[in-house]
Structure formats: structure tokens, C-alpha cells
Curated annotation (Swiss-Prot):
Its main location: cytoplasm. This is Flagellar assembly factor FliW. Keywords: Bacterial flagellum biogenesis, Chaperone, Cytoplasm, Translation regulation. Disulfide bonds: none annotated. HAMAP family: FliW. It is found in: Cytoplasm. InterPro entries: Flagellar_assembly_factor_FliW, Flagellar_assmbl_FliW_dom_sf. It comes from the Bacteria. Coiled coil: none annotated. One of its GO terms (biological process) is bacterial-type flagellum assembly. Interacts with translational regulator CsrA and flagellin(s).
Length: 152
């Protein structure tokens, strides 16, 4: 299957690589099929590209690479909807936003993306009863001062 992307060009994707979001993603409820594109093999960064809209992709971040204490509880209903189990564990991502400088990047802790890779099902979960922010600065001031301009 060929997918057009303004960011990545033409992608040749196998049907089993497509992650289905039955409820869409808040703000993009009509978009129900995406492909997950790792940045590099061991990178905590990746992308979620719409299969239908060439200009719709999200920067995803592995939260545990930057915020090891990040945690939340999925309801039994949500775990059931995503068909999660010991054999089908969740994969969790945060949507990131890059500002003018990479050191000002923020992530949405309040609405993680939860994916069952084995079943190719995903959902953006909006957490309640939490102090998490939708604009959590990814790099602390200490880490930011160690990162050269341009993020290299």
C-alpha cells in the first residue's frame, strides 16, 4: 500500500503496519488509520503518519526515556477495548511539539497514545484526576543548558 506524506514522501507500507484508531485522535476524529515510523532503531522519537492525509503526522516520544516516573492506570474497559494482555502489552507514546528551539520541546502527558502493536489498535487516552500537563517541557533547564543549539 502506498501512502503519501509531505514529511516523508511516498511510503510503501504493508497492511499489517497500519495502526487503527477506531475513535480517531481528538481533533482528528475522522482519521482512523496511521502508520508508526521509528526515527532510528534505538531512538525515543518516532512519527505517527496518517494513511489518508499527507500533511498529518505527529511527533511521538517514548515517555520512559525522559520521564521514568510517568505512570497512569488504564481502566479495565480501555484495556479490553485495546485487547491488552500479558501477551499483548501496551506501548505508550506522548505527542510532542517542537518550538523554535529543540530545548523548548513540550510533550502532552495528559493524553498519551496507547497502542497494542500485536493487534494494530491504538487510542489516545485522556487522563483524569491527574496533575499532568498538556505542555510539559521535555528537557529540564539543566539538560537544556547541556544541549547545543540545534539539539545536536
Amino acid at each position: 500500500m502506498k501512502i503519501e506524506s509531505t514529511r516523508f514522501g511516498t511510503l510503501d507500507v504493508a497492511p499489517e503496519q497500519i495502526i487503527h484508531f477506531p475513535h480517531g485522535i481528538p481533533g482528528f476524529l475522522g482519521e482512523k488509520a496511521f502508520v508508526h515510523l521509528p526515527h532510528d532503531e534505538n531512538s525515543p522519537f518516532s512519527f505517527l503518519q496518517s494513511t489518508a492525509e499527507a500533511d498529518l503526522s505527529f511527533l511521538l516520544i517514548d515517555p520512559f526515556s525522559f520521564i521514568p516516573e510517568y505512570e497512569f492506570v488504564l481502566s479495565d474497559e480501555m484495556a479490553g477495548e485495546l485487547e491488552l494482555s500479558e501477551e499483548n502489552p501496551p506501548q505508550v507514546f506522548l505527542i510532542g511539539t517542537v518550538r523554535e528551539k529543540i530545548t523548548d520541546m513540550t510533550v502532552n502527558l495528559l493524553a498519551p497514545i496507547v497502542v497494542n502493536r500485536n493487534k494494530s489498535i491504538g487510542r489516545q487516552i485522556i487522563l483524569d484526576k491527574t496533575e499532568y500537563s498538556i505542555r510539559h517541557k521535555l528537557f529540564s533547564e539543566a539538560k537544556a543548558s547541556e544541549t547545543p543549539e540545534g539539539g545536536k
